[in-house]
Amino acid sequence: MSARGPAIGIDLGTTYSCVGVFQHGKVEIIANDQGNRTTPSYVAFTDTERLIGDAAKNQVAMNPTNTIFDAKRLIGRKFEDATVQSDMKHWPFRVVSEGGKPKVQVEYKGEIKTFFPEEISSMVLTKMKEIAEAYLGGKVQSAVITVPAYFNDSQRQATKDAGTITGLNVLRIINEPTAAAIAYGLDKKGCAGGEKNVLIFDLGGGTFDVSILTIEDGIFEVKSTAGDTHLGGEDFDNRMVSHLAEEFKRKHKKDIAPNKRAVRRLRTACERAKRTLSSSTQASIEIDSLYEGVDFYTSITRARFEELNADLFRVTLEPVEKALRDAKLDKGQIQEIVLVGGSTRIPKIQKLLQDFFNGKELNKSINPDEAVAYGAAVQAAILIGDKSENVQDLLLLDVTPLSLGIETAGGVMTPLIKRNTTIPTKQTQTFTTYSDNQSSVLVQVYEGERAMTKDNNLLGKFDLTGIPPAPRGVPQIEVTFDIDANGILNVTAADKSTGKENKITITNDKGRLSKDDIDRMVQEAERYKSEDEANRDRVAAKNAVESYTYNIKQTVEDEKLRGKISDQDKNKILDKCQEVINWLDRNQMAEKDEYEHKQKELERVCNPIISKLYQGGPGGGGGSGSSGGPTIEEVD
C-alpha cells in the first residue's frame, strides 16, 4: 500500500455505482450504509436537504422533478445533441441549456438551482468516496474511474472533471470492459499459457458494451468494442411498465400515464419483479392505491416478460457479431465469455448468448454488478505502486473506440489513428496546402468511421498561420495526433520550413469545463457537503433533545420511583418536559444551537432533582446520573 493511503476503484454507472479497494492481496467490494454493495447513481434535492444514493432513489416517487439520475447520459454532451434531446422526453426533471451545455434544474431549499452533469456525477462520486472512507477508516485521495468503451474524448474528460470536483486525484479513466477483464484476469490467473480470446458482454442498467480482448502472459489487449449506449435494464423495465399500465387501463378504465407518481411507483414494482423473474418463473405485483384510490394487484410470468422484450433481447447479439467482425475472429475462436452488468442475470439473455456460441459455458464466477469496480480497484492498486504478487504481472492496453482524423480537401475524412488502435499512441502525417500562396491552414479534427467528415463528429479545430507564400503542394505541414493513457487527445500542426506550430487538446470546443468552473464547483461541492453535515448535526441535536426529554419523562413516571420523588419535583419535571415537547412540535426546523439550548434548559431543571434522587450522585450541570439506578446520559 502506498504511503498516501489506498486508492479506490469506482464503477460510475448510469443507474448504479459500485466501489472497491485492493488491500491485503485481494479486492473488497464495499457496502454502503444500507448494506448494499451497489449504490443508485441518484441525487435528490428537497426543501431541507440533499440526498444521494439509496435515500435519493427511495423518495423519487414523492419528488420526481427534483431527483436527478442518468447524469451519465448528459455528461460531456452538448444540449443540442440528438440523444440528449430524445432522453429529455423521458426524464421527469428539467434540463436547460447554458452556453450550449445541458444543466439540470431543480428546486433546492426553496430556490431554483442549476447543475452541470459533472456536478451531479461528482456528488455520486463523493458518496462512493465516503462509503470507502467509512470502511477504510481514513481519507481516500486517489481513484480509478471507469467509463463505457463508447465514451468519446469529451465524455471521458468530463468524467475526470467530476472526479476532480469531488476532490479525488483521478489516476486514470479506464474502459468498463477493460476493468472487467482485469478482474477476470486475476480470477483466472492459473490458466495454461498461450493467447486467450475473451468476449465481455456487459449489459447494465443503461448501457450495453461488447468487447473482445486477448490475454497473454498477463497482458490485456482490447481487440474490438461494440455496443449500444442506450440499451439496458431500464429498457426492459419500461416494456413491463407500458404493459402493466395498459392492463390497469383495461381493468379499471383509468390511464395512469399523466400521473408521474403513479408511473414511478409502478416502475419501482416492475424493477423488483424483473429481479425476481431471474430466479423465479413468476412474480406478483401489489401496489396499494396506485391511482385515484384503486389498488393494483397482478402477476407476470417469466415467459410474458421475455415476450415483451423479445426484440430487445435478440438485438443484443448484433454488437456481438460486429465485435467479432472487427476483431477478425470467428465465434469458435472465443475461449471465454464473461458476463458483466446486472441485466446479464436474465436467463433468456444467457440462453441466447450461449446458443449463439453453440452451447459454450458462460463465465458467471464474478458477480456481474461488481466486476467493473473490482477491476478498477486492482488497476488503482497498480497505479499507486502496489507490489502485491497478485497484481505485479498485469499490464493494460486500452484502445480508441473511434477513428480519429482531420478533414482534407473536399470534406474527406483522413484518419490518422484507426479505431481499436491500442493507446497510448502517437501518429504523424504530412499534409500540404491546397492553393497557391496559402498563408494558413484550418486543421479540423473529427472522430468517426464515415468517409466524409460531415457524417462524423467534429472534436475541435484550430488555424496554423504564418505559412510563407509558396505554390500549392510545396509547404510541408506535419500533423501529430497524440493520445495519452486516459484517451485524451492532443493534436499539433507544425510548418516544417518555419518550425511554427499550433496545437489543441481536444476538450475545449466540446464544452469542457474551464479551470475556473472546476474550482468554483469544488468550492460549491464543499459548501453542499458542509450544508449536508450541518443538517445532519441539526437533526442529531433535535433527536438528542427529543430522546432526553422522553427518557426523563419516562424515568419520573416510573412506578419504582413512587415515594422517592416529591409530587412537586415530579410535576416540575413533567411540566418542563411537556413544554419542551410542545416547543419541538412547533420547531421542527430549528438550528442546532437552539436544540442544544433547549436541552440545557431542561437539564438545569432536571439534574438537581435527579441527583437528589440518587444520593451521592454529582450535582447538576453535567447531565449524567450516578452509579445507582438508571443513568441518564446526554445523547451524542
UniProtKB/Swiss-Prot annotation:
Subcellular location: Cytoplasm, Cytoskeleton, Spindle
Annotated positions of the N6,N6,N6-trimethyllysine modification: 564
InterPro entries reported in the protein's UniProt record: ATPase_NBD, Heat_shock_70_CS, HSP70_C_sf, HSP70_peptide-bd_sf, Hsp_70_fam
Organism (species): Capra hircus (Goat)
Bias-annotated ranges (Gly residues): 616-628
Subunit structure: Interacts with FKBP6. Interacts with ZNF541. Component of the CatSper complex. Interacts with RABL2/RABL2A; binds preferentially to GTP-bound RABL2. Interacts with SHCBP1L; this interaction may promote the recruitment of HSPA2 to the spindle. Interacts with MOV10L1.
Modified residues (Phosphoserine): 403
Protein name, as recorded: Heat shock-related 70 kDa protein 2
CDD domains tied to this protein: ASKHA_NBD_HSP70_HSPA1
Highest taxon in the source lineage: Eukaryota
Binding, ATP: 13-16, 72, 205-207, 271-278, 342-345
Keywords tagged on the record: ATP-binding, Chaperone, Cytoplasm, Cytoskeleton, Differentiation, Methylation, Nucleotide-binding, Phosphoprotein, Spermatogenesis, Stress response
Domain notes: The N-terminal nucleotide binding domain (NBD) (also known as the ATPase domain) is responsible for binding and hydrolyzing ATP. The C-terminal substrate-binding domain (SBD) (also known as peptide-binding domain) binds to the client/substrate proteins. The two domains are allosterically coupled so that, when ATP is bound to the NBD, the SBD binds relatively weakly to clients. When ADP is bound in the NBD, a conformational change enhances the affinity of the SBD for client proteins.
Family designation: Belongs to the heat shock protein 70 family.
Chain spans, region Disordered: 613-636
Record-linked SUPFAM superfamilies: Actin-like ATPase domain (SSF53067), Heat shock protein 70kD (HSP70), C-terminal subdomain (SSF100934), Heat shock protein 70kD (HSP70), peptide-binding domain (SSF100920)
